[in-house]
Design a protein with these regions (language model features):
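Hydrophobic, aromatic-rich alpha-helical transmembrane segments
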Residues: 10-18, 22, 78-82, 86
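Small-residue-rich helix-loop
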Residues: 39-95
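Broad structural signal for hydrophobic residues in well-ordered alpha-helices, predominantly aliphatic
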Residues: 35, 67-68, 99, 118
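Select transmembrane alpha-helical segments in multipass membrane proteins
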Residues: 10-11, 62, 77, 113
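Membrane-interface interhelical loops and short interface/amphipathic helices
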Residues: 1-10
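Long, positively charged, glycine-interspersed low-complexity recognition regions
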Residues: 75-153
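Transmembrane alpha-helical segments in integral membrane proteins
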Residues: 13-40
Length: 153
């Protein structure tokens, strides 16, 4: 049992370490941006994270790595698995921006966001769905549709 757990962890350990480092980099960047904005020391305008978009080739690369992680054997599969793990972060961030835009559209949005983040912190697995939602958003464009619908109202 213990060996099986170790074998499974080893499969994604490099990707997990890199992803952890990148998440801390994003969090520290956002906190730093918030601080300089609060003290009015920012040299550039605050980015609109709600409208975060990724280049189209990133979707293709992410999908290819995901498929490769499933079907490729040996070292290539190991590389694809860890690279797909790392590539999930940009799509996770896009998925979060979609959730935030959707929460703005409803009256109890802040409460739902708090519950969602608690669920994600407690269980972790909702992050996978958020990343897939970000991948789908790249093609579907929910946020643009919602923004144009709210302008028409």
């Amino acid at each position: 049992m213990q060996e099986k757990v170790i074998d499974n962890v080893v499969l994604v350990l490099p990707g997990t370490v890199a992803l952890s480092w990148l998440v801390m980099l994003v969090i520290n960047g956002a906190l730093g941006q918030g601080l300089v904005l609060r003290f009015k020391r920012n040299m550039r305008p605050n980015p609109d994270f709600a409208m975060l978009e990724l280049p189209n080739w990133l979707s293709v690369l992410g999908a290819a790595l995901l498929i490769g992680s499933i079907i490729l054997p040996g070292s290539f599969g190991y590389f694809a698995k860890n690279a797909a793990f790392i590539m999930a972060l940009p799509f996770f961030l896009v998925g979060l921006s979609v959730i935030h835009v959707a929460a703005r559209r409803i009256s109890a949005g802040m409460l739902l966001l708090i519950l969602f983040y608690l669920l994600m912190l407690l269980f972790g697995w909702p992050a996978i769905f958020v990343a897939f939602f970000g991948l789908i958003e790249q093609r579907a464009g929910f946020r643009r549709k919602w923004a144009s619908a709210s302008k028409e109202e």
